[in-house]
Amino acid sequence: MFGKLGTSELVLILGIALIIFGPGKLPELGKSLGKAISEFKSFSKEVKEDISLDDKKANNTLND
């Protein structure tokens, strides 16, 4: 999920976020980030389904 980020890099990023946003703001920030990622995945899935449907329609048109 995080590409080639290792544990030490993730800990460093979390530490920097803790310094910048403070401990009180991190749960809210994490919740917002999780929601944004979820919405992006949902949107991505919809786009893939639309493309697949359009592709099937185009293939059916060509085969007729």
From Swiss-Prot:
The chain crosses the membrane at residues 10-30. Forms a complex with TatC. GO terms for cellular component: TAT protein transport complex. It comes from the Bacteria. Part of the twin-arginine translocation (Tat) system that transports large folded proteins containing a characteristic twin-arginine motif in their signal peptide across membranes. TatA could form the protein-conducting channel of the Tat system. It is found in: Cell membrane. This is Sec-independent protein translocase protein TatA. It is a single-pass membrane protein. The lineage of its organism: Bacteria, Bacillati, Bacillota, Clostridia, Peptostreptococcales. GO terms for molecular function: protein transmembrane transporter activity. HAMAP family: TatA_E (MF_00236). Gene3D superfamilies: 1.20.5.3310. The gene is tatA. Its main location: membrane. NCBIfam families: PRK14861.1, tatAE. Belongs to the TatA/E family.
